[in-house]
Structure formats: structure tokens, C-alpha cells
């Protein structure tokens, strides 16, 4: 990327940070401390007054009440030798009820939890984000019935699975801008989001970013029967009994885990079929053989360009997803969607002019091998030429 283009990119980052309030924290300040055990939240009079004030702000207020007001439990664990990171385990679902309030009006009420009928279940999600911000943990929401929390005019947007992203996702507009860039550059699905205030068991928890989750679905990642969604995951070690397999190319502390088929439903035959396909692709990649029959190279180029535009400094690749739409020999491995932007746009100190994936000692995605191939470089250049003049105009309307 030439110096002029680099300066354009940096100016774009500065502009986004300025309009987002210079990176100031937008989260609530009066957050309770959390434990790794189940506790009961007891709202105070001050909490009740603050909830009334939150109802008047105009943003949707998500009031979640768990059965018996039990906090969703979790335990923090440290990576074993040879692995990396912090994450949470024992993060089991708690039955709950959700009431959505906007402008002092109740616009939605799930009712109490009844399996497949009403309510939802809530659990703590995430890795570092779940550990580093006590009182403002991220959550996964699993509804008994499909719902579109973003109120769009297509029933296909309805889904049971949603997430509430905490700080740093909720502190500025970087995640919103990054998803807009992902949609524009990749010409494919990226999660839709919106800011919401969250009250859990009567206690205000601050500002969150409501987001669609990465999963199979007609309006998400439509892989269908016979297809798969994989994540190359540095946190595989937190669930060693789950199905997984290593890569021949990626850093050894990462392994492929399954997003679809679900780890509870996947068969040994499916695991073998999927891993064999990946290994055939990796062998061809490592030995300089043609890879076009295995991979949609344009999607890999777009994935890398997204992170170069964002200046991603995440050494683990910011959640690397792959998908294949069916079991037919004609369908190809695709890279994406992009996810996790806590290391983007200057949030992590980084002096490189590219994303961290260009570093020669860091194999993020398959970039180290792909950059040796003319066909990949051609696709990367084509993608840049297609998008370079429309990035700002595309992103601004979504902020």
C-alpha cells in the first residue's frame, strides 16, 4: 500500500475516533464488582432512580431478570503451558426474562422462561472481555423463540442467538465502522448492531453493543446442510472435550473449533470429512500446488484487506472464521466474517503500516503462505481498486 493510501487510511481512522468522542468511555461508571460464583443482585434505591433516568435517554433499555435473581456464573481460567490467554469456564445458562423499554414504553416482553415457548437463557461469553471488565461482562442471549431484536421487515432475520458486547466494543463506534467496512469490502454478511443500555436483576450494568452472532442462518452465514463454519481459536484449551483439530499452517497454540455443526450434534464422520478437506487445502498451499479448487481466494484477500484498513494489531487474528456452504465438491472454503475489533484503529499500540498478520513470524489466517502467491496478490489489488474510493462514504451513514 503506497504512502498516500496509508495517509488516507490514517486520516480516516483519526476522523472516526474524533466523531466517536475521541475514544472516551461511554460505559456506565457505577458498575458492581463480579465474583466467579453465583450471587444474588440486590438493587438499591439509587439503582432504581438510575433505571428511571436510563428509560428517558432514547436508547433501548434491556431489563433482564434471571430466575431468583441469580447472576450468570463463571470461573476465570489461565491458559496452560504452550497456550495463550485468559478465558472463562463454568459459564452456564441462567433462565431469564427480558423486557425492552424505549422512551418509557415497554416495546417487548419475553415472559418468564419456558423451554421452546417463552423467555430466554443468559450466560457470560467472551474471553479477555469477560475477564478484564468486572461488573460489565459480555453476555450471550438464547431465546426460546426466534426474534429480530433489530426490528427489520424480514422474518428471516429472526434468530434465537444474540450477544451483548461490553467494553471496549461499547466505548466508541469502532465496531460499527468495522462491520460496515467488512460488509463493503467483503460484499457479504457482517453482524448488525445497535447500542443498548442493560439492567440485570435491577442493577444498571452500563452501555452494551447488541449484535447478531456468527452462526448458520439464511441472513447470517448460510452454509446449510453439509456445510460448516470453523473458528481458528486460541482458546480451544478451555473446552478440551469439544471436537477440534489443529492446523498445519497456523500458530501451534491455535486449533479449529466448530461453530456449525454444533459441537453437541456433530458426528465423527463429519469431523473427519471437514478436517480432511482442510488438510488437503493446507497441503496444496504449503507445497505450492493450485488451491483454487479448495478456496475462494477473493474472500481471503478481502479478509486481509479489511484488517489492513482497520490496522488490526491482534496477534491472534481477531477471531478467524471460515465457512463452506455445502458438501459439494464445487463449493469452496471462504474466509470471514471478520469479528472482534478491540485491537483495531489504534486501540492497541502498533507502529506497522499494515495489520499484524503481515509480520513474518506470525501466521494469522493463511496470509503468510498466500502472500507468496501471485493469484492472491492479484485478488488483493483488485479488491483494493474496487473499494478504495468508497470507504468513507459507505461507513459514515452507519455511524
Go through the PLM ranges and name each one.
Residues 29-117:
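Regulatory N- and C-terminal appendages and interdomain linkers associated
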Residues 99-100, 105, 111-168, 267:
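Conserved oxyanion/phosphate-binding beta-strand-loop segments in alpha/beta enzyme cores
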Residues 53-57, 89-92, 113-116, 131-135, ...:
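Extracellular/periplasmic catalytic domains that process cell-envelope and extracellular macromolecules
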Residues 95-107, 173-187:
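Zn2+-dependent metallopeptidase catalytic core
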Residues 1-30:
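Bacterial Sec-dependent N-terminal signal peptides
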Residues 142-148, 156-169, 187-191, 203-305, ...:
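Internal "kinase-insert"/substrate-recognition segments embedded within catalytic cores
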Residues 138-142, 161-166, 180, 197-199, ...:
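Structural recognition of the beta-strand scaffold that forms the well-ordered cores
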Residues 35, 49-53, 58-60, 70-74, ...:
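Middle-to-C-terminal accessory/interaction subdomains
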Amino acid at each position: 500500500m503506497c504512502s498516500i493510501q496509508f495517509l488516507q487510511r490514517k486520516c480516516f481512522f483519526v476522523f472516526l475516533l474524533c466523531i466517536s468522542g475521541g475514544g472516551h468511555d461511554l460505559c456506565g461508571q457505577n458498575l458492581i464488582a463480579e465474583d466467579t460464583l453465583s450471587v444474588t443482585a440486590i438493587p438499591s434505591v439509587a439503582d432504581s432512580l438510575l433505571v428511571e433516568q436510563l428509560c428517558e435517554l432514547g436508547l433501548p433499555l434491556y431489563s433482564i431478570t434471571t430466575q431468583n435473581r441469580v447472576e450468570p456464573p463463571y470461573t476465570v481460567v489461565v491458559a496452560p503451558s504452550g497456550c495463550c490467554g485468559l478465558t472463562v469456564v463454568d459459564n452456564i445458562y441462567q433462565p431469564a426474562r427480558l423486557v425492552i423499554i424505549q422512551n418509557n414504553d415497554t416495546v417487548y416482553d419475553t415472559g418468564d422462561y419456558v423451554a421452546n415457548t417463552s423467555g430466554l437463557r443468559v450466560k457470560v461469553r467472551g474471553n479477555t472481555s469477560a475477564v478484564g471488565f468486572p461488573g460489565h461482562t459480555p453476555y450471550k442471549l438464547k431465546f426460546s423463540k426466534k426474534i429480530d431484536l433489530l426490528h427489520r421487515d424480514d422474518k428471516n432475520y429472526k434468530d434465537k442467538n444474540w450477544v451483548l458486547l461490553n467494553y471496549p466494543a461499547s466505548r466508541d463506534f469502532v465496531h460499527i465502522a468495522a462491520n460496515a467496512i467488512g460488509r463493503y469490502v467483503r460484499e457479504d454478511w457482517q453482524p448488525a448492531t445497535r447500542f443498548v443500555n442493560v439492567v440485570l436483576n435491577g442493577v444498571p450494568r452500563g452501555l452494551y453493543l447488541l449484535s447478531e452472532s456468527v452462526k448458520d442462518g439464511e441472513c447470517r452465514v448460510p452454509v446449510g446442510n453439509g456445510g460448516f463454519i470453523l473458528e481458528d481459536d486460541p482458546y480451544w484449551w478451555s473446552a478440551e472435550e469439544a471436537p477440534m483439530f489443529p492446523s498445519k499452517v497456523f500458530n501451534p497454540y491455535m486449533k479449529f473449533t466448530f461453530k456449525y455443526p454444533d459441537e453437541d450434534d456433530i458426528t465423527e464422520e463429519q469431523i473427519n470429512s471437514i478436517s480432511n478437506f482442510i488438510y488437503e487445502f493446507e497441503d496444496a498451499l504449503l507445497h505450492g500446488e493450485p488451491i483454487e479448487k479448495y478456496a475462494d481466494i477473493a474472500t481471503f484477500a478481502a479478509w486481509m484487506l479489511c484488517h489492513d484498513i482497520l490496522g488490526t494489531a491482534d496477534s491472534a487474528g481477531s477471531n478467524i472464521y471460515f465457512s463452506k456452504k455445502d458438501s459439494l465438491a464445487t463449493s469452496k472454503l471462504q474466509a470471514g466474517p471478520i469479528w472482534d475489533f478491540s485491537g483495531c484503529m489504534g486501540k492497541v499500540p502498533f507502529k506497522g503500516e499494515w495489520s499484524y498478520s503481515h509480520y513474518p513470524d506470525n501466521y494469522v489466517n493463511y496470509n503468510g503462505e498466500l502472500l507468496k502467491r501471485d493469484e492472491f496478490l492479484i485478488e488483493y489489488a483488485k479488491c483494493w481498486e474496487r473499494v478504495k474510493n468508497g470507504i468513507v462514504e459507505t461507513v459514515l451513514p452507519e455511524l
